[in-house]
Amino acid sequence: MSDAHGIARDQLRAFIERIERLEEEKKTIADDIKDVYGEAKSMGFDAKILRKVISIRKQDADERMEQEAILDTYLQALGMIPAAETEDAA
């Protein structure tokens, strides 16, 4: 029975160590990404907009179009953008 506990303990330790290593790698990558945003900002690019562009590029085209349509509807309802002209108005 002691041998089974030893094996489980070793497996648990291995999982924990792998997770810790991956967490450290994740932190390193996050720091690298932060540095790239800083570099882009120093060259005159807006980091907030860069993040938005990356977010948009991750989306499926249909999903993005649907979200843009909903956003336009909300903005029109609030009077923040003019309502789209209908074909009848032309």
Swiss-Prot record:
An example molecular function term from Gene Ontology annotations: DNA binding
Pfam families per the UniProt record, alphabetical: GapR_DNA-bd (PF10073)
InterPro entries for the chain: GapR-like, GapR-like_DNA-bd
Signal peptide boundaries: none
Family per similarity comment: Belongs to the UPF0335 family.
Classification via NCBIfam families: PRK13694.1
UniProt protein name: UPF0335 protein Smed_2680
